[in-house]
């Protein structure tokens, strides 16, 4: 159902472990074109966790800055800060974890720092090489990537939209296959989770 072009309700079906049924029955509260709150009347959970997590039952669950950028999402329990380019500079989670981003003057992401508990992971992006805590981990290619720890190639097979559907090893063996809901969530994934880039939609 739509109101002036904005979706005000949405129902999704999905895999509930052994059955298939309603995983989301969402109603949206808007303030103009900005989302103010989401309520989910569905009680079932999806087997892959892609159902909406209704983490707050408040009149206002989403807050924005003067630029219209989201600064609080109470359903996900996050707060977002932005830099002068209006790019996210830090995301704070309700459990105390943080993700901090560093960009070049052109807005290209150079570094991500994850802090979870007492563990800090620093990821640096240097052209097509990804470093983790100072060690080169991946070399990105047009066809996929090379894992630098074992010097093995991994190839992406994409669909007509450019979504990564299958990842194969250098011998052509399947490592991962992904099947998507129309909204982008993975409803089935076979094999190992060998790459993070999935739905492009």
Language model: regions and residue ranges:
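Conserved catalytic cores of ATP-dependent inositol ring kinases
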Residues: 1-53, 106-108, 113-115, 121-122, ...
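Short, acidic, Ser/Thr-enriched surface-loop or helix-capping motifs
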Residues: 2, 29-30, 65, 83, ...
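Beta-turn initiation residues at beta-strand->coil junctions
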Residues: 9-15, 37-42, 66, 71-76, ...
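A motif-centric feature for acidic-aromatic and gly/ser/thr-rich catalytic loops and repeats
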Residues: 20, 28, 150-201
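Short loop/turn microsegments at loop-to-beta-strand junctions
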Residues: 25, 58-60, 76-78, 98, ...
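A residue-level detector for well-ordered beta-strand positions
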Residues: 26-28, 61-62, 80, 101, ...
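Extracellular repeat-rich scaffold modules on cell surfaces
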Residues: 49-81
